[in-house]
């Protein structure tokens, strides 16, 4: 199972956009093994990433943009179909990625969930994608997609890809019940809390070449009590003579509501720990 996205690598910028899909596509071309891989990629939600679209407009989940994004991903991936096509984050305005907890309802023009599903349905019918999934979605959003697909006879969401780890267990509130009852698979990403659960950033450490040094966008795991919680997890790992990375990954992998644990490596040498 390979998971990527049209905007990768991160942080998103014009110079590197699509590079991860190109790497995977070249790998498929060399190995001739496309049919042995379940391939997932993602289309950007609403964001000011004007370099992604031909008309330089901000990204959104309009039918036109989704069709354009799929075609470009297929070219980069050197394939004629995508097994799982995911909405990277919601099209509607909302708090995301470590924002404040005091939710404020934000009204704004957005593509309806029905229209998004309708566009994805066309892509399934012509064979460019096979299944659809969500990412960084809320319990309400997940249920609304399921509701619309049932009522309008449109494709059903098969998965949701959200962050889940020892420092971020928000998915257990609402999300876990939905995936059980509705049979929607959780693809859990960031099992190491973007590296924090390895302990390498403790006491202000900043290893050279680490994700935090390369692009410091990890403040969501630097809140009050985070360092103390990490220290306690490190103590547990030490007590049982296991690597902290393995402890964190096994926690995610063994949860009964997790379908797959998505591991992201900055360097190939990290694979030994995971």
Region spans (language model):
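N-terminal binding-site loop/beta-alpha segment at the start of enzyme catalytic domains
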Residues: 1-43, 67, 71, 80, ...
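Conserved small/polar residues in nucleotide/adenosyl-binding loops
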Residues: 267-274
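Conserved, mostly hydrophobic/aromatic
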Residues: 2, 24, 39, 73, ...
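Glycine/proline-rich, positively charged
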Residues: 52-161
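Active-site beta-loop-alpha junctions enriched in small/polar residues
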Residues: 7, 42-46, 87-90, 135-140, ...
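Glycine-rich, positively charged active-site loop/lid region within alpha/beta enzyme cores that binds
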Residues: 49-50, 93-105, 180-236
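Basic phosphate/pyrophosphate-binding loop/patch that engages nucleotide-derived ligands
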Residues: 125, 171, 175-185
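A structural motif corresponding to the C-terminal end of an alpha-helix
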Residues: 31-33, 76-81, 119-130, 182, ...
């Amino acid at each position: 199972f390979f998971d990527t996205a049209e905007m990768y690598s991160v942080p998103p910028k014009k110079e590197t956009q699509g590079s991860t899909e190109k790497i995977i596509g070249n790998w498929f071309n060399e190995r001739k093994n496309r049919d042995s891989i379940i391939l997932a990629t993602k289309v950007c939600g609403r964001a000011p990433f004007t370099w992604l679209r031909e008309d330089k407009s901000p990204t959104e989940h309009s039918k036109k943009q989704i069709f354009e994004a799929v075609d470009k991903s297929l070219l980069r991936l050197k394939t004629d179909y995508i097994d799982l096509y995911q909405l990277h984050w919601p099209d509607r305005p909302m708090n995301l990625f470590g924002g404040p907890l005091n939710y404020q309802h934000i009204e704004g023009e957005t593509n309806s969930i029905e229209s998004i599903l309708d566009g994805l349905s066309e892509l399934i019918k012509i064979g460019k994608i096979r299944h659809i999934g969500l990412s960084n979605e809320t319990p309400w959003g997940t249920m609304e997609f399921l509701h619309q697909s049932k009522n309008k006879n449109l494709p059903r969401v098969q998965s949701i890809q959200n962050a889940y780890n020892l420092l971020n267990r928000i998915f257990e509130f609402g999300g876990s019940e939905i995936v059980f009852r509705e049979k929607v698979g959780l693809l859990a990403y960031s099992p190491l809390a973007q590296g924090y659960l390895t302990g390498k950033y403790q006491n202000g450490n900043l290893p050279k070449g680490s994700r935090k040094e390369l692009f410091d966008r990890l403040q969501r795991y630097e809140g009050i009590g985070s360092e103390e919680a990490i220290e306690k997890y490190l103590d547990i790992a030490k007590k049982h003579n296991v690597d902290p990375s393995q402890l964190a990954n096994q926690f995610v992998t063994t949860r009964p509501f997790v379908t797959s644990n998505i591991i992201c490596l900055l360097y190939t040498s990290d694979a030994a720990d995971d």
